[in-house]
């Protein structure tokens, strides 16, 4: 099983580090699992250096899409175009997205349109404030996600209120 893990901003790397550690552990135990780490470059951060990845004990990203800043539409379109080109080179079984940044939504849409399962870490979180771009990212991502890793009972209830069955919530 190949899992493509998406990170768009510095906090995403901290959230995916334990997931990467577990995948590496499972692979070392002979399980047929591997991952590809893609950084969209949505939030440029000069602190994302080799030292940062060493501290988290994760490898540097396999790919940096280098999207950078721009309007919401420019970022979304740029991420979708670059991610689709990259993912078609080695189609994974699962695309794992994190949080509520534009990269989360854009990569989830691309994966779903290619019939690839989507896992959303921090699914179900809501502010109910549609003036926040992050809330729109969360809602769109959750609408097309196959499996949700949640952080609270409130998130579970939000997903259930949207008709998501228990067997898709972890």
Give the positions of each predicted feature.
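Conserved nucleotide-sugar phosphate-binding/catalytic loop shared by glycosyltransferases and other
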Residues: 33-75, 82
């Amino acid at each position: 099983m190949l899992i493509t893990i998406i990170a768009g901003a510095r906090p995403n790397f901290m959230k995916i580090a334990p997931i990467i550690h577990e995948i590496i552990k499972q692979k070392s135990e002979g399980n047929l699992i591997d991952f590809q780490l893609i950084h969209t470059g949505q939030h440029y951060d000069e602190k994302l250096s080799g030292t940062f990845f060493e501290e988290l004990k994760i490898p540097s990203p396999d790919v940096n899409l280098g999207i950078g800043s721009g309007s919401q539409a420019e970022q979304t379109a740029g991420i979708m175009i670059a991610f689709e080109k990259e993912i078609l080179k080695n189609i994974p079984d699962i695309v794992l997205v994190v949080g509520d940044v534009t990269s989360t939504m854009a990569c989830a849409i691309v994966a779903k349109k290619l019939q690839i399962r989507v896992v959303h870490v921090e699914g179900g979180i809501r502010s109910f404030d549609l003036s926040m771009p992050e809330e729109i990212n969360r809602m769109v991502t959750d609408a097309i996600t196959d499996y949700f890793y949640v952080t609270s009972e409130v998130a579970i209830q939000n997903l259930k209120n949207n008709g998501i069955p228990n067997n898709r919530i972890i």
